[in-house]
Amino acid sequence: MGMFNCLHGNNMSGQHDIPPEVGEQPEQEPLEAPGAAAPGAGAGPAEEMATEPDSEPSNNEPVPDETGSEISGPPEDSKSDIQSPCQAFEEVRVGGDYSPPPEEAMPFETQQPSLGDFWPTLEQPGPSGTPSGLQAFNPAILEPGTPTGASPGLGAYTPPPEEAMPFEFNEPAQGDHSQPPLQVPDLAPGGPEALVPRALPAEPGNIRFENAGFREDYSPPPEESVPFQVGGEEFGGDSPPPGLPRVIPQIGIGGEFPTVAVPSALCLAPAENAPPLWVRGAIDRPFREAVRSPPNFACDSPPMEITRPLLEIGRASIGVDDDTAVNMDSPPIASDGPPIEVSGAPDKSECAERPPVEREAAEMEGSPTTATAVEGKVPSPERGDGSSTQPEAMDAKPAPAAQAVSTGSDAGAPTDSAMLTDSQSDAGEDGTAPGTPSDLQSDPEELEEAPAVRADPDGGAAPVAPATPAESESEGSRDPAAEPASEAVPATTAESASGAAPVTQVEPAAAAVSATLAEPAARAAPITPKEPTTRAVPSARAHPAAGAVPGAPAMSASARAAAARAAYAGPLVWGARSLSATPAARASLPARAAAAARAASAARAVAAGRSASAAPSRAHLRPPSPEIQVADPPTPRPPPRPTAWPDKYERGRSCCRYEASSGICEIESSSDESEEGATGCFQWLLRRNRRPGLPRSHTVGSNPVRNFFTRAFGSCFGLSECTRSRSLSPGKAKDPMEERRKQMRKEAIEMREQKRADKKRSKLIDKQLEEEKMDYMCTHRLLLLGAGESGKSTIVKQMRILHVNGFNGEGGEEDPQAARSNSDGEKATKVQDIKNNLKEAIETIVAAMSNLVPPVELANPENQFRVDYILSVMNVPNFDFPPEFYEHAKALWEDEGVRACYERSNEYQLIDCAQYFLDKIDVIKQADYVPSDQDLLRCRVLTSGIFETKFQVDKVNFHMFDVGGQRDERRKWIQCFNDVTAIIFVVASSSYNMVIREDNQTNRLQEALNLFKSIWNNRWLRTISVILFLNKQDLLAEKVLAGKSKIEDYFPEFARYTTPEDATPEPGEDPRVTRAKYFIRDEFLRISTASGDGRHYCYPHFTCAVDTENIRRVFNDCRDIIQRMHLRQYELL
């Protein structure tokens, strides 16, 4: 019986302590056609077995190790008891300090776990039996080149390919069907060691996968694909370097294990220069390791018959073709072949599923295969689940690409449809559908462009390829008798198992040499984005027995050896047509050498044409051919895809170690490696030197040696382009939380700055308020109260004249220049007020002449028309004061009748300034009249509202508030009672014989007494002292001296009043006047003393508001009183 071998994520080469899982070999149905594995991302065998309810418990449950990863199987000692005595140098492991490059064939070790009683021992026909060492060897994964007499133990030494002893296979007659083809795991070189497990424990059968299709959203579980870390970070010291997977068993999808006997005999013949063993899919394939043959094999061993169970393919990761069957019916290998040439294995980053956005990138690396034909079934490219389709159904669909090939071959020229279609690399053989990734299969357009091509089962159909005229003639002239000989080396398909190379867009000149040998060394071209001006270069199929290209010169022995070495450097295709192969298909070694020479020369010509054309982008180019020799310089790699693969935390369980973009530029060796990363020793050493505790970005930036070599010699290894591409690649997406934190920090900083500015502004405001408060406390606020027309506004005018340098509008100005300018402007506006006073005075007198009892007559009756004129303009608004007005007013004022009416002014309401302005008619009527300060003081303007005047006396601030004295204006006074230092109550002493305007029955002096009493007794003003200004002393003296209006007539008490002894008359003042004024004073003092409580006082002063010197002297006397009141107000006195 046999075993089907595929890669397992937890059982890779180099991990010797993890044997294959128990219970992974269900019985399989009969095998009809082995082939490449179907690329898929479905659940692996271990995961399906874990979900099977009837399965027996396994003794290798996942055991988490120190790093948190799961390791399947019981731990075993990685060292073997059997060590090869011919070991040439010390075994190199992953955790070691040195790993030779892939050019040097690295030894690999094999492990021999016990098989138990499940697998039968190997049968070997012939006189000699199988040695005991091979009884425990798994026939399904038998290493080619393993000696029949002895099996190398764990840690055995395998020499490099230059010293390796060749071996050859002898095929018995085709009639003997007693042995299936031997399957050899596709391994790739490039690492320190390669582990090939030899047996599997028993596993319950009757397990069939329900879903064998493709799932794009699937990531294999850790049991199937667990990446490893360099330096034993994940599994200890025996973890392989990146890109070297472990070989694990794969479950078949059959119910039983019937044996299909296929004739196959293994004869290991010693030879000095045997050709290398070709392993299908060893180049440009992820999870591949090259299998090398140990030296000193015995050639006289009898044939060995090996049986194995049926092969049925479940699922495999896209781009991973690790279940290729091994054909024991390959042509014989001569004993004088060149040494083994081994290509490197690509990085592991291609394992698991590919994102849908990676279609073009995945096509660059080699078009993966679909499900292999199992039991005569071919996975249908039209179905997304990867289910199989019968070959008959495939035959019913003729492939247009295949027809184009036959037509092009007969005509000897390539057809446009064959050259421009994407199916040129998708044509399979043995009924195998073109391998496409799951994302490509889900695309109807791609499916239409890549139709399934099923060739004749015995014909070995070649991929769709335009052939050169020479080869077209060779193909067209080939006779049917020569066809069977070509079946031994089937045509390469577009799958990655045949070492697929990317389709390179080349110029027509390079396309002339596009036909290459279809040996396993020739690589089919996967699908790549088409460009309008370029044509794909698919791999063409050539007859291996043709010997040479027609017209090609003869080759010498050394050239043939070099060509054979280049040709055999590619993978060996075993068993692709094993059931249909015949002994006649074996080709001779010279034919192989010539074909290999053609392949190498064509590939180098393609590479030369590609570099010369410079039409395609280097980012989509791969090494031109897998036949790169050891002596060739390192091949520059295209830059890695920066955003193709998700990050570590986004790829599921299967990819937790390899990042999407590496922090260092990876340098390829001469091995043909994948896009994502090299698996050569140099790259392995670079990764190994990384410290596991630090991220890659930190390691790159902190390694000066690597940075120096990268900058100095980066161009030699393709580092400049890689670095440039990485620098141009889009950066990692910004973390929204980090952006939010930055925004919050920015807002916090702005808020702090705003708060700081607000605090500073608040401090300035507080300081200003403090200054204002201090000024407010140091300011003396004086409130002018009194009855109407008492002279309050005149007092304010005097303060402005005395302490504010004239009139400056309604308020004071500290700037003298501004005060003067404002004073001039205000004086100009006061002219109209003065004229209005003049008009009002003459009109009032003329009107009273007829209203008085007895009426007053004009002394000159000729002035009657003048009286009529004055009465006619009495109520005219906006009077413009024409010159005749002044003439009529002057003539009337000179009339004696008018003067007599003025003497009775106490009987009607006449303004106090009437006589003053009537005497100045000649001055006022002038056009350039400018009122004087006395004119402004005399001018009468009705005060309505509250007016504040600020002035300063000896650096002491005073605020004086003027209010209207009429009854309807007194309600506004309450607004000025707050924080008043003193109240200046102004009384018109001369108004004793006059009545108020509001009431013709109320005496003005009596009105003033009543108002003073109310203010003095007001509860809000009971703590505020009152300065009493007994105003209009000049008018009072005139009336008293005139004798026409006696005070005792209005105030009878005056008759009994005597002048007090402390009275101080003015110089030259009449005693009658002194007695009159002191009488009025005592009337107010009697009110204050009658209700006084000692908390406020009354300070009387005799004033004449129009006398500036009098007001200056009075105000200076009041300053001390005001300051004393201020100190008492704040309880400082």
UniProtKB/Swiss-Prot annotation:
Listed binding positions for GTP are 786-794, 936-943, 962-966, 1031-1034, 1105
Location of ADP-ribosylarginine modifications: 940
EC identifiers of the protein: 3.6.5.-
Region entry G3 motif, spans:
958-967
Q: Spell out the family assignment given in the record's similarity comment.
A: Belongs to the G-alpha family. G(s) subfamily.
Q: How does it assemble?
A: G proteins are composed of 3 units; alpha, beta and gamma. The alpha chain contains the guanine nucleotide binding site. Interacts through its N-terminal region with ALEX which is produced from the same locus in a different open reading frame. This interaction may inhibit its adenylyl cyclase-stimulating activity. Interacts with MAGED2.
User: Where does it primarily localize?
Assistant: membrane
Q: Other remarks on record?
A: This protein is produced by a bicistronic gene which also produces the ALEX protein from an overlapping reading frame.
Loss of function: phenotype: Mice cells lacking XLas isoforms which are then transfected with these isoforms and a range of receptors demonstrate that the XLas isoforms are capable of functionally coupling to the same receptors as the Gnas isoforms including Adrb2, Crfr1, Pthr1 and Tshr.
Pfam families cross-referenced by the UniProt entry:
G-alpha
| Positions of post-translational Phosphoserine modification | 1091
Q: Which gene encodes it?
A: Gnas
Coiled-coil ranges per UniProt: 737-761
Q: Where is this region: Disordered?
A: 1-195, 322-552, 611-648, 724-744, 807-828
Q: Which GO terms describe its biological process?
A: adenylate cyclase-activating dopamine receptor signaling pathway; adenylate cyclase-activating G protein-coupled receptor signaling pathway; cartilage development; cellular response to glucagon stimulus; embryonic cranial skeleton morphogenesis; embryonic hindlimb morphogenesis; endochondral ossification; energy reserve metabolic process
UniProt name for this protein: Guanine nucleotide-binding protein G(s) subunit alpha isoforms XLas
Q: Which GO terms describe its molecular function?
A: adenylate cyclase activator activity; adenylate cyclase regulator activity; alkylglycerophosphoethanolamine phosphodiesterase activity; G protein activity; G-protein beta/gamma-subunit complex binding; GTP binding; GTPase activity; metal ion binding
**Positions of the UniProt region annotated as G5 motif:** 1103-1108
What is this enzyme's catalytic activity, as reactions?
A: GTP + H2O = GDP + phosphate + H(+)
Question: What job does this protein perform?
Answer: Guanine nucleotide-binding proteins (G proteins) function as transducers in numerous signaling pathways controlled by G protein-coupled receptors (GPCRs). The alpha chain contains the guanine nucleotide binding site and alternates between an active, GTP-bound state and an inactive, GDP-bound state. Signaling by an activated GPCR promotes GDP release and GTP binding. The alpha subunit has a low GTPase activity that converts bound GTP to GDP, thereby terminating the signal. Both GDP release and GTP hydrolysis are modulated by numerous regulatory proteins.
UniProt region (G4 motif), positions on chain? 1027-1034
